[in-house]
Amino acid sequence: MTYQAPDENGFYGKFGGRFVPETLMKAVKELDEAYRASKTDPAFQKELNYYLKEYVGRETPLYFAEQLTAHAGGAKIYLKREDLNHTGAHKINNTIGQALLARQMGKQKVVAETGAGQHGVATATVAALFNMECTIFMGEEDVKRQSLNVFRMELLGAKVVSVKAGSRTLKDAVNEALRFWVANVEDTHYIMGSVLGPHPFPEIVRDYQSVIGIEARKQHLEKEGKLPDAIVACVGGGSNAMGLFYPFVDDVSVQMHGVEAAGHGLETEFHAATISKGEIGILHGAMMDVLQDENGQILEAFSISAGLDYPGIGPEHSFFRDLGRAAYHSVTDDEAVEAFQLLCRTEGIIPALESSHAISYAVKLASQMRPEESMVVCLSGRGDKDVNQLKERLEGQTND
């Protein structure tokens, strides 16, 4: 069977859809039409491919992590090096596409939310490239955690708005960015940073991120003469994971593993494991698994990694879980920090804390597999942004 989702109403099974105020319905439909048209427009696709190659630096390598593999003592571990993209993460694959789309719709201003700051930097980058006005909403907590990325965005000409509402993290930044979009919808495009939000956003972001899996599939076939036995990626909203997974969805021999943030542990209140612990609800314009209390109030998500502490998850991930097509696991802060250090020492690669969650699970999984088997892990971003946070954490532990 060939996988086909979403349906014409933007649903992935019971997840997804389009739950937006009337003021946004026109903009969302306009976006949908522009996106469909762009897919069959050779000039648009040519320009997109030009920027991905010449500006972003694609394709990214599929690197055999020989020492990490030896450490795990099982399957071969390949790293899809999204950390080598311009701006240091997978986020720019999507922002380039959406900025071109905004330009096609005649919109000269863009707005975005950001958690770790990576999507904010990638949005500010393309706004500078295409000479667009850019506003970024970021939770006050994240502004503190990621002050370097705030400065980067400002250097690139963006206005960064610190959000003081609620938990002052990603969820609240999305709320404010959506409000801003409602008020400025005529001349502003919302560059959604993950496979979230009302239809067609999850589909658009998935398709722009699919370059990850398309390349990885081809590269692995060239290196090993077969498809990988497993693919692994971290999941917050889930765009790097969906970008890796989607091109493999019909290859049923390939196991797909998403890794959520377990924070201090699933038995505590301090985690961001939405697919393990969430229940169905509506958040930011779509039906999805959401961390909520018995009254349906959205709970605060928690993770050492600012890019994973979102209380929802992309609707297509929940659909994959229901179909049994992908399995979802979780990794604690401590395990992620351990994996961060392990990759530094074995391969000389400093990964983002987000990606470290995937590395942690991948090492565990590889050790249970045979040496003739192989896996691809999405190294979604580099860890420069996290070094300071990690330094403080490790120094704190030695002082205790």
Curated annotation (Swiss-Prot):
Record's keyword terms, sorted: Amino-acid biosynthesis, Aromatic amino acid biosynthesis, Lyase, Pyridoxal phosphate, Tryptophan biosynthesis
Subunit structure and binding partners: Tetramer of two alpha and two beta chains.
Cofactors (names): pyridoxal 5'-phosphate
Cited function: The beta subunit is responsible for the synthesis of L-tryptophan from indole and L-serine.
N6-(pyridoxal phosphate)lysine modifications at: K91
Catalytic reaction list: (1S,2R)-1-C-(indol-3-yl)glycerol 3-phosphate + L-serine = D-glyceraldehyde 3-phosphate + L-tryptophan + H2O
Organism name: Listeria monocytogenes serotype 4a (strain HCC23)
Protein family (similarity comment): Belongs to the TrpB family.
Pathway membership: Amino-acid biosynthesis; L-tryptophan biosynthesis; L-tryptophan from chorismate: step 5/5
Protein name per Swiss-Prot or TrEMBL: Tryptophan synthase beta chain
